[in-house]
């Protein structure tokens, strides 16, 4: 099967023709934290650009910060007095936390920092700078000249949606008051470069030159204008922008009839959420998961893998609970398939999985770097007697990583150790968490179980070195020969070590503990 990004890249080349440079675009209004749902738009544009580059094409990925949009409402996590800044450009609203030049910069800088960890580069542009520099001045004037044509297009779609037409006073632009910087009322246009305004906030009246940057195109005109200005070939969009009669439909007509360019190809991307979290994430509401939250428990390549393997038009729910362990298992399997150490069900699946891995890695490794099983690390990081070196030693003894480790191997293992610790602290359900009991609990055990425990203890005393499989067989045989049901037997063993009825896989767990400690505990001596 062809990966969806490759399919899109081929379609772009086929429909846009052979070009010297292809332009892909993404865009976000920094009105709140840029969350993992917003990231889907950015990554979809990036990965399609990646697929184009893999075909030898030159690609420019523009990420447009729509920081000249109005500050529409005060989020819950912002002081209420920030309402005095409503309708100003978000780039000109002060940072409530006092650490950045503006409200918008606070969110933009964090996202750009997060992106760099994923090995992704893009051309970050700021709408505020483009408008203020006069870059869009000719297009603004053109939109004013063709105001009636634009209004007719918008009204046509409004009629189809059974909505009333736009008011006769409607204009394709909005104005920021040069004095107080809040949204002013449009009065008139002189037919050339000046528009008259009246500010309902500070009372100022006058003229402003389009080239001075106080005049901004409204969204449904701004978007198609950008497509033409930057010669955009591809831009993904959320389903709200791609519904019938929405901004993509109107933009498609406006860009052709007003700005003389063909609308870019697009892909609809679906909602991204966290499994178990109700409702849609909102950067202004504050109920968001950021890329930096994912970095606490996932390798960068696995974050990219989540988005690369899922078709954009499918809803994506990231499981930070037990499902995260399955995600690590899945990624490690795909990585082994890529390096030829395992095989998929069939050649088609293998080809797609290998391609997904290529698109997932910030930098493709030349070999398989040591994979410390995340599930097992979740157990090991909860053992107080093990530091990082001790954990690595256990991994080597039990055959999970090679005896001879390179710096890259050690770096990756230590990263996973830190991620496993974070996961246990932040997301692990209670039945996964445990702590070793300092002394045996006072519980009643029937004689057969005591005998089985002593048998395992004697075997351990006779064997300084052993494999996990050997220990596993001894544990099962000791119970089987005495007719002890497995459930009862394991419950007893977990209780004497961690005081719970269930726990991590028993044989690897016991093999990770000090042998003398295990022997004494099985004898209920300490």
From Swiss-Prot:
UniProt keyword annotations, A-Z: Aminoacyl-tRNA synthetase, ATP-binding, Cytoplasm, Ligase, Metal-binding, Nucleotide-binding, Protein biosynthesis, Zinc
Family statement: Belongs to the class-I aminoacyl-tRNA synthetase family.
SUPFAM superfamilies in the record: An anticodon-binding domain of class I aminoacyl-tRNA synthetases (SSF48163), Nucleotidylyl transferase (SSF52374)
Cofactor note: Binds 2 Zn(2+) ions per subunit.
E.C. number: 6.1.1.6
CDD domains on file: LysRS_core_class_I (cd00674)
Cofactors named for this entry: Zn(2+)
GO molecular function: ATP binding; lysine-tRNA ligase activity; metal ion binding; tRNA binding
Binding-site residues for Zn(2+) 1, renumbered to this chain: 95, 99-100, 106
Residue positions of motif 'HIGH' region: 30-38
Origin species: Thermococcus kodakarensis (strain ATCC BAA-918 / JCM 12380 / KOD1)
Signal peptide positions (record): none
Record keyword Cytoplasm present: yes
Residues holding Zn(2+) 2: 177, 199
GO cellular component term, pick one: cytoplasm
UniProt protein name: Lysine--tRNA ligase
Catalytic activity, as annotated: tRNA(Lys) + L-lysine + ATP = L-lysyl-tRNA(Lys) + AMP + diphosphate
Protein's cellular compartments: Cytoplasm
Family matches, as NCBIfam families: lysS_arch (TIGR00467)
Motif 'KMSKS' region location, chain numbering: 280-284
Cross-referenced InterPro entries: aa-tRNA-synth_I_cd-bd (IPR045462), aa-tRNA-synth_I_codon-bd_sub2 (IPR020751), aa-tRNA-synth_I_CS (IPR001412), aa_tRNA-synth_I_cd-bd_sf (IPR008925), Lys-tRNA-ligase (IPR002904), Lys-tRNA-ligase_SC_fold (IPR042078), Rossmann-like_a/b/a_fold (IPR014729)
GO BP terms: lysyl-tRNA aminoacylation
HAMAP family the record matches: Lys_tRNA_synth_class1
